[in-house]
A protein has these predicted regions:
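N-terminal extracellular/periplasmic Venus flytrap/periplasmic-binding protein-like
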Residues: 11-13, 24, 28-33, 44, ...
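Active-site-proximal alpha-helical scaffold in enzymes
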Residues: 87-118, 155-185, 256-263, 328, ...
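Active-site pocket-shaping loop/turn-to-helix segments
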Residues: 13-39, 59-62, 85-99, 138-146, ...
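Phosphate/pyrophosphate-binding loops at sites that engage ATP/ADP/AMP, CoA/4′-phosphopantetheine
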Residues: 38-51, 154, 158-159, 265-269, ...
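Glycine-/small-residue-rich "gating" segment that lines the acyl/pantetheine channel
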Residues: 121-159, 163, 218-243, 395
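Conserved beta-ketoacyl condensing-enzyme motif
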Residues: 22-113, 118-136, 189-213, 287-288, ...
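Conserved catalytic cysteine-centered active-site region
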Residues: 25, 57-111, 142-149, 222-249, ...
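Condensing-enzyme catalytic core mediating Claisen C-C bond formation in acyl metabolism
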Residues: 1-27, 223-291, 295, 360-361, ...
Length: 395
């Protein structure tokens, strides 16, 4: 079986949904912009070498429908002969697309694929016609729970305190602030000029303005534990513990990752960041979907005869602090190996792109820190965990 490598990964900055820099920007336009940037950054790879585009999207409807993977390919500098498709596994869609690309390369179908994902929650328009399967809703009601309600289930069922959630959320904000100060994200972010709808809070008047998204805009470095403790629960106002402060932020953005056979990378003279070593998913009860990594991580490690101690860096998506705290403690992941530069609580979480962002970031971390193995993992709506294994490419 052929070795598969991660050659490069780029993304937009992450903007706040509805009131941030991408509130008028389509996801296929974001993807086309960073695909072009990927081509520009890798001039030794001719555009015609890219055989397919695989893009993840958490809610591929409305502005995100009509196969944004193919649309992005057509909008970009890629030739018309490059295909494109869109995949959905909710919050793991971005890493799912990378896994699908890697699997097809391993099988000999392709040599070069650009994978990734996008989400614009600002423009998301869900089609609710016939949305609910009545038999499914009756037999497994948790599958239709809002994600925040599943977080409350985890908090109550497994006794994860409000204090532990807020402490984790505070640490995430501080780590992202430090990462931004040190430039830890700079190499992966591609600035994008766009138009933003700016609304005057006092008058309600709105106008379009020229705007450049050149960094992540969601971090709140002024966050305090006292401020987090003062926030009211959102999903269970009377007895809950999940707040806006200890949950991931709604945001807009896109990420693409260049996935290639090792032989093709050598042929083109490209220096990969990491090997793709494996990927797995596993289901859990839908009403506690946040603990999905507790299922998929052991399965992944067993598949490759590894233990938690063998992994040098972990990227565990911060959908909610409660599920990160639970999975961290249950799996035995040390905090000094986990989400070293913060995560979705402090950076933002455009559902379809986060997995690709995490893969790109952990690949760089492995190189910058001279570490060997990294795992990216996340919970998934509907009750699942998804996990991927990556290894630093030797210098």
């Amino acid at each position: 079986m052929r070795n598969v490598v991660i050659v490069d990964s780029v993304r937009t900055g992450l903007a706040k949904s509805h009131r941030g820099g991408f509130n008028m920007t389509r996801p296929d336009e974001m993807l086309a912009h960073i695909i072009d940037a990927m081509l520009d950054r890798n001039p030794d790879m001719p555009p015609e070498a890219v055989e397919d585009i695989i893009m993840g999207c958490g809610n591929p409807e409305g502005a995100q429908g009509h196969n944004i993977g193919r649309n992005a390919a057509v909008l970009s500098k890629l030739p018309m002969t490059t295909g494109g498709t869109t995949v959905n596994r909710y919050c793991s869609s971005g890493m799912q697309s990378i896994s699908m690309a890697a699997s097809q390369i391993m099988a000999g179908c392709y040599d070069t694929v650009i994978a990734g994902g996008a989400e614009t929650i600002s423009m998301m328009n869900m089609n609710m016609d016939n949305f609910v399967n009545e038999r499914l809703a009756e037999e497994v009601p948790g599958i239709y729970f809002p994600m925040g309600m599943t977080a409350e289930v985890v908090a109550k069922r497994y006794d994860v305190s409000r204090e532990a959630q807020d402490e984790y959320a505070f640490e995430s904000q501080m780590r992202t602030a430090a990462a931004q100060q040190s430039g830890a994200y700079d190499d992966e972010i591609i600035p994008m000029e766009t138009k933003m709808l700016l609304t005057n809070k006092e008058t309600g008047d709105s106008k379009e303005v020229e705007y450049t998204v050149d960094k992540d805009e969601c971090n709140r470095p002024e966050t305090t534990l006292e401020g987090l403790a003062s926030l009211k629960p959102v999903f269970d106002p009377e007895n809950g513990s999940v707040t806006a402060g200890n949950s991931s932020q709604l945001s807009d953005g896109a990420s693409v990752t260049l996935v290639m056979s090792e032989d093709k990378a050598k042929e083109l003279g490209l220096k990969p960041l990491a090997y793709f070593r494996g990927f797995t998913t596993m289901g859990c009860e839908p009403d506690e979907m946040g603990i999905g990594p507790d299922y998929s991580v052991p399965k992944l490690l067993k598949n490759y005869n590894m233990s938690v101690e063998d992994i040098d860096i972990w990227e565990l998506n911060e959908a909610f602090a409660v599920q990160v705290v639970y999975c961290r403690d249950k799996l035995g992941i040390p905090m000094d190996k986990l989400n070293l530069d913060g995560g979705s609580i402090s950076i933002g979480h455009p559902f379809g792109m986060t997995g690709s962002r995490q893969v790109g970031h952990i690949a760089r971390q492995l190189n910058n820190m001279d570490k060997q193995f990294g795992v990216v993992t996340m919970c998934v709506g509907g009750g699942m965990g998804a996990s991927g294994l990556f290894e630093r490419y030797p210098s």
